[in-house]
Regions:
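Extracellular receptor-binding modules and their adjoining Ser/Thr/Gly/Asp/Asn-rich linkers
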Residues: 1-47, 54, 60, 66-99
Length: 99
């Protein structure tokens, strides 16, 4: 599954799948951290979310900063680049339970 972010880089997206790709809105990269929520009915509060950068000229630090039933939050920033681009973030949900 894929989804493209609208409006700005803090606009949330909805993608109901255990893996997929999120295309960020076109904007200049920034070293200042920004966050957005991914609404996803496949996510449980105990799951683990894996992220990696699929594309983009700039390099991005990608963090999952919250996981809840039905959503997770991505916080990101560039490592210093300011290219205007639409980077793509791949994600995967690892189904887990708290031990």
């Amino acid at each position: 599954s894929t989804v493209t972010q609208g409006t700005n880089r803090t606009t949330g997206v909805t993608i109901n799948a255990v893996s997929g790709a999120i295309t960020l809105v076109s904007a200049a990269g920034s070293a200042t951290a920004a966050s957005f929520t991914v609404t996803n009915s496949a996510v449980a509060a105990t799951d683990v979310i894996i992220l990696n950068q699929k594309s983009g000229t700039d390099k991005y630090d990608l963090l999952v900063t919250a996981v809840a039933a039905g959503s997770f939050e991505i916080t990101f920033r560039t490592t210093g680049g300011t290219t205007t681009e639409q980077p793509v973030i791949n994600f995967a949900v690892i189904k887990a339970v708290a031990a």
